[in-house]
Structures are given as structure tokens and as C-alpha cells.
């Protein structure tokens, strides 16, 4: 600091312009703050009018409770709010806004006009302010019950900020995304958007499951709803509901991911980690899952006052939230079988909310214990699937046979029978059924193409199966079950490896010693910042022990759990399954193909191979007719 500089108070205008840098980044930021105020006022319809991407004009009009004439000037003051009164109120805040600085920040960098009327008032009142003149002017106006806010010429008095704005289309895309997120968060509110005089979006209130599904489809696209699983699970004060996209509906970018905590759209690394972990075994490398999920918990269980934009949150029991999210999504994705993917629901049904072990139970250190082994869970009998075509409808039922997990030694030879010559009796045993009611989801094999693909016929049409990919997933799941039932054996190191850590990392290792031991590790603390690795899992004897332990400790300290060891083990099991699976160009007889189809129907995650590629696809009669221009 130079000797001639003196400490002085900043002017209110300059202070607000500096604060606006945190709150007002672009027109989308303004829209977010104004829309959240409308929702907090109890609005049931919100109209948004935009010109030039929101830079020239952004007008938000609602039918909420309105603001009294006396409170209008105060609404533009910094840290003035009706949401909280004391610090303790932050622990239970449910409103989207509460900091009381958005309108002051916006009015400091734009020309703002706010008109409002309460239900008890005989007339409306209007207040105007500009960035260079912070003194609001209040006057009577005509307006129905509710509030309208006009923001014109954004950043007109801060040219440096305006230079950083992107093209009109880019800014409008960001603004539209804000509206989409809020429209997903509040199904009970109608949203209507116009840009340069043209209607862009019109979403009416959605009060039932069908209307909600229709709104999600309008925002995320009909393809998402056709490839999404509805979930609704509640346990230990946490409820997760919404829709998760099937792994086959993944995206190259993370642009179709919506997560809400108590109705607030958030981007949280703990949530992202739990979702990524749940999709780990079924998503192709470099692809991103799709989901619209809502987490509900007690307001005092989450801190929303982490950042001025309120995009980040902090959970009081982060470990429990992480385990609940992972367990729920993992179970939902594991339960997807071919019959679930054949019938795309026209409307989203309400699901029962499983409790206890139905939703997945977790041990002391976060590992998941299913109610029964993965491959021992029989599917419910008499599953019905409709044709879904335009012709005469029909239904068929199929009761799959529960498969039994095999010991690890036997798992490598699961399909040894594939390589034996078939007799006439075996062929007769797989004869096609005489009635449609006996057709299983993946149907019955017709032929093999180039020794790679199985062609089968089911009630919908033609099924094509990647033989090696499907068998690889079956082998992989059985190896995982066998490993879980038999446990992990440790491999003592001839010369223990010494690991230099921080004291915090060493404390974490000591705290989780039993967890490491169950996974085949033996760690010994030699000093405040020194650790000895004496034993590692036998399957990971080729791994770099020091690096693996350090990475696991980093995860444990950040998330309270780690999937790195399991990821290494799964990679090895996947390699074993790949080598043990039936190879391409291996000619299979019809009974062998049918045996593979039946096992696919009884295996978790059989829709994707270990690398996330699809294992089968369906072509209905309508699809085939289009290829030959039939019916035109």
C-alpha cells in the first residue's frame, strides 16, 4: 500500500457494482434471480419476455402475492429481505432466495423498473432506478395482483463487463436453460417464454404423474422419457425420486443432468461422485449419464448459504447422502432387464418406495449389502409386455428361471456346454412355443450372423444380440457375486512398503483399518506421518500399492468412501470375463443361443457389456416395414 492511500468507504453504487460481479454474470443470472423471487412469492404463472438474448430487455411477470407500496423502495436496498430475520433462520430456509442482494446488484448495472400490487391494494405501484442513480422513484401504476420486473440495457454503465457477453444466441441459450431448470423444479407453476416477439416455451401447470412426465419430455426430449427409469425411494429421512436415463441413452456431454435438493437446482461434487459411481459398470468410456432427480431432506440437513449464486450446497451428513444416492441408483440400474427395456411407458407410474434392505443397506464403511445375492434374485412371475404397435394388441407372459451364483472356480466354465456337440434331445427341448403367451422377453433364436450376432424373434419383432458382449456381462456379474461370497484373500509383501503421509492421512488410514483389512490390505502405522503396507489383495499384486493406498485415502477424506479398490478389482474381473466369454466366429447351435438369451434375461445390467457398449437391440415390425417402404 502506498503511503498516500487512505482507507475510505466505497459509495453504495460502487459497492453494489462490485457485488454484482458475484451475482450478475450474464442475462441468465438476472433471469435466475427474478424467477426465484417470483416462485418465492407464491406465483402459479410466470411470463418471461426477452429481447436480444436478455441484454436489451428481460421482463418477468408473475401472479404472486405482490409487494406493498411501502416495501417497494426497500426491495431494491442491499441485504433487505422478507425471507429471514435471524441467523438461525438460515438452518431451516426453504425459499430460493434469502440473501437480499440480487435486486440491488441488478439495479446497479441496468435500468430496472418494478411494478407490483398486493391483493389488498386498490392500485399498483411502480419503482424505477438506474445504475448511476440509486435513488428509487415510486409512482402509481396499473397492474393486476402480482409483480413485473423489467431489466433494460444490462451492463450499460459497465462497458468492461458488457464486452465479456457472448453472441445473442449463446446468451439466450443460457437464459433458456435457467428457465428449464426452474420448470423442472416446480411442476406446479406454469412457465411461458417469448424471445424477440416469438413464443419459445409454453409449459402449463403439471399436477399429476402424466402431466409431470409430459413436462419432463418437453424439456429433456421425448427420447429421454422413452429411455428413462422412474424411481421413488425413501429411507432414513431421505427421499430420492425422479427419472434416470438408461445407460444406452448416455450423452457425449453432461448437458442432460438435473439434480435438485429441496427444489433447488444444485451442482455438487458429492452428488456427481455418487452418480458416476452408480453408472461405473454400465457406461461407455467418455459418455455421461442423463437424469432428472429430486432429493428431499430436512432443511437443517443441508447448508445452501455456501455461495452467492446458491448453486453449491453442503450436506450435514454427506456420507449418508452419498451412500443413499449411490445405493438407490445402483439398485435401479441393476434391476433393468430386457423386459423393462422393451416396453417404453406412455406415462410414468408411481412406484412403491422400498425401505430397509430393498433400497440397499450399507455397512459401517459404506459397502453395499443387497437383500440377496445379485444373481439369486428371481424376477417377479407373470411379467406382461404389450406389443405397442399400431395393429391388434396382444400380451404375453414369461416366468424366467432364477440363476444361481457359481463359485469362482466354476465360473470360468459356465458355458463349457457351449462347446459340446448337441444331441437331438437337447434340440427338442428348445422347440419354439406354440402360443404367444410363452414367448420370453428376448424371444427365441433364429440364426447366427457371421459368428458374431444372434438373431432372435420375440413378440415385438427382431432381436439382435452381440454374442460375445452379452456373454462377457454374464460372466462378469457371476465373477463379482463369487468374489463377494468368498471374500478377498491377501498377499503378504516380502518387503513391506513404507508410505510417507500427512498426519491427517495417517489418522484416516488408522480410522479405516478394518475396512482396509476386509479388502485384503494390512496397514500398520509406524509414526505420526508414516505408514507401512504389509499386505495387499492377491488379485491386485501387480498394482502399485503406495499409489493405490494414497488415492483411496484421498477419496475417504473427501467423500467418506472410495471405489478405487473395487474399480481395480472389477477391471481384473472384467478381463477374466472377457477371456472366458464365448468368442466371435464361434458357431453356436440354436439351443446354445437360447441358453444365452435366457441367462441375459436373468442377469443384472445385461443390456451393456463390461465396457458400457449395448449387448442387444430391438427392431419392431414398424421399423422393418420402414426399411421396405411398406404401408406407404
UniProtKB/Swiss-Prot annotation:
Keywords tagged on the record: DNA damage, DNA repair
Top-rank lineage group of the source organism: Bacteria
GO biological process: mismatch repair
Pfam families: DNA_mis_repair (PF01119), HATPase_c_3 (PF13589), MutL_C (PF08676)
GO molecular function: ATP binding; ATP hydrolysis activity; ATP-dependent DNA damage sensor activity; mismatched DNA binding
GO CC terms in record: mismatch repair complex
Disulphide-bridged cysteine pairs: none
Tagged with keyword Disulfide bond: no
Annotated Gene3D superfamilies: 3.30.230.10, Histidine kinase-like ATPase, C-terminal domain (3.30.565.10), MutL, C-terminal domain, dimerisation subdomain (3.30.1540.20), MutL, C-terminal domain, regulatory subdomain (3.30.1370.100)
Stored SMART domains: DNA_mis_repair, MutL_C
Family under the similarity heading: Belongs to the DNA mismatch repair MutL/HexB family.
Cited function: This protein is involved in the repair of mismatches in DNA. It is required for dam-dependent methyl-directed DNA mismatch repair. May act as a 'molecular matchmaker', a protein that promotes the formation of a stable complex between two or more DNA-binding proteins in an ATP-dependent manner without itself being part of a final effector complex.
NCBIfam families found in the cross-reference section: mutl (TIGR00585), PRK00095.1-2 (NF000949)
Name the record gives this protein: DNA mismatch repair protein MutL
Organism for this UniProt entry: Pseudomonas putida (strain GB-1)
Recorded name of the encoding gene: mutL
Amino acid at each position: 500500500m502506498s503511503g498516500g492511500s487512505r482507507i475510505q468507504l466505497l459509495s453504495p453504487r460502487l459497492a453494489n457494482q462490485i457485488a454484482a460481479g458475484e451475482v450478475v454474470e450474464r442475462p441468465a443470472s438476472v433471469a435466475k434471480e427474478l424467477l426465484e423471487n417470483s416462485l418465492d412469492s407464491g406465483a402459479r404463472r410466470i411470463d418471461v419476455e426477452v429481447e436480444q438474448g436478455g441484454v436489451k430487455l428481460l421482463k418477468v411477470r408473475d401472479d404472486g402475492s405482490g409487494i406493498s407500496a411501502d416495501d417497494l423502495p426497500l426491495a431494491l436496498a442491499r441485504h433487505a429481505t422478507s425471507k429471514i430475520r435471524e441467523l438461525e433462520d438460515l438452518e431451516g430456509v426453504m425459499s430460493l432466495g434469502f440473501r437480499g442482494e440480487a435486486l440491488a446488484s441488478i439495479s446497479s448495472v441496468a435500468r430496472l423498473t418494478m411494478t407490483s400490487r398486493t391483493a389488498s391494494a386498490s392500485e399498483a405501484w411502480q419503482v424505477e432506478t438506474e445504475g448511476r442513480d440509486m435513488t428509487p422513484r415510486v409512482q402509481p401504476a396499473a397492474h393486476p395482483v402480482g409483480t413485473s420486473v423489467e431489466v433494460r440495457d444490462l451492463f450499460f454503465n459497465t462497458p468492461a463487463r458488457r464486452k465479456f457477453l457472448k453472441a445473442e444466441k449463446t446468451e439466450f441459450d443460457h437464459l433458456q436453460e435457467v428457465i428449464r431448470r426452474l420448470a423442472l423444479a416446480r411442476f406446479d407453476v406454469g412457465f411461458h417464454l417469448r424471445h424477440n416477439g416469438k413464443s419459445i416455451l409454453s409449459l402449463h401447470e403439471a399436477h399429476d404423474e402424466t402431466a409431470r412426465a409430459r413436462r419432463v419430455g418437453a424439456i429433456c426430449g421425448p427420447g429421454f422419457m422413452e429411455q428413462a427409469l422412474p424411481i421413488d425411494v425413501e429411507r432414513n429421512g431421505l427421499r430420492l425420486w425422479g427419472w434416470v436415463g438408461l445407460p444406452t441413452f448416455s450423452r457425449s456431454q453432461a448437458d442432460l443432468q438435473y439434480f435438485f435438493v429441496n427444489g433447488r437446482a444444485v451442482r455438487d461434487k458429492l452428488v456427481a461422485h455418487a452418480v458416476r459411481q452408480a453408472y461405473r459398470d454400465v457406461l461407455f468410456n467418455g459418455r455421461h449419464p442423463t437424469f432428472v432427480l429430486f432429493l428431499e431432506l430436512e432443511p437443517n440437513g443441508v447448508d445452501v448459504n455456501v455461495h452467492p449464486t446458491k448453486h453449491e450446497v453442503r450436506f450435514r451428513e454427506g456420507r449418508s447422502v452419498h451412500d443413499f444416492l449411490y445405493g438407490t441408483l445402483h439398485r435401479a440400474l441393476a434391476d433393468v432387464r430386457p423386459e423393462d427395456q422393451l416396453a417404453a411407458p406412455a406415462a410414468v407410474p408411481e412406484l412403491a418406495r422400498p425401505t430397509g434392505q430393498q433400497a440397499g443397506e450399507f455397512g459401517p464403511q459404506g459397502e453395499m449389502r443387497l437383500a440377496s445375492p445379485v444373481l439369486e434374485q428371481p424376477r417377479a412371475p407373470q411379467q406382461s409386455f404389450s406389443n405397442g404397435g399400431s395393429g391388434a394388441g396382444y400380451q404375453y407372459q414369461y416366468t424366467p428361471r432364477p440363476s444361481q451364483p457359481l463359485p469362482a472356480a466354476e465360473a470360468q466354465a459356465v458355458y463349457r456346454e457351449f462347446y459340446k456337440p448337441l444331441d437331438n434331445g437337447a434340440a427338442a427341448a428348445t422347440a419354439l412355443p406354440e402360443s404367444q403367451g410363452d414367448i420370453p422377453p428376448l424371444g427365441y433364436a433364429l440364426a447366427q450372423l457371421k459368428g458374431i450376432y444372434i438373431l432372435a424373434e420375440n413378440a415385438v419383432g427382431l432381436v439382435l444380440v452381440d454374442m460375445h458382449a452379452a456373454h462377457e456381462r454374464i460372466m462378469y456379474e457371476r465373477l463379482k457375486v463369487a468374489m463377494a461370497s468368498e471374500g478377498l484373500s491377501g498377499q503378504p509383501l516380502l518387503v513391506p512398503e513404507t508410505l510417507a503421509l500427512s498426519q491427517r492421512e495417517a489418522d484416516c488410514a488408522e480410522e479405516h483399518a478394518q475396512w482396509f483389512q476386509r479388502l485384503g490390505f494390512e496397514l500398520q502405522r509406524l509414526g505420526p506421518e508414516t505408514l507401512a503396507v504389509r499386505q495387499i489383495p492377491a488379485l491386485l499384486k501387480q498394482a502399485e500399492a503406495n499409489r493405490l493406498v494414497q488415492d483411496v485415502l484421498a477419496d475417504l477424506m473427501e467423500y467418506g468412501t472410495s471405489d478405487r479398490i473395487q474399480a481395480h478389482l472389477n477391471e481384473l474381473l472384467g478381463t477374466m470375463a472377457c477371456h472366458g466369454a464365448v468368442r466371435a466366429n464361434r458357431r453356436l447351435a440354436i439351443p446354445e443361443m437360447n441358453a444365452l438369451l435366457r441367462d441375459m434375461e436373468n442377469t443384472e445390467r445385461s443390456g451393456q457389456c463390461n465396457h458400457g457398449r449395448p449387448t442387444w437391440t430391438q427392431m419392431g415390425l414398424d421399423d422393418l416395414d420402414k426399411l421396405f417402404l411398406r404401408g406407404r
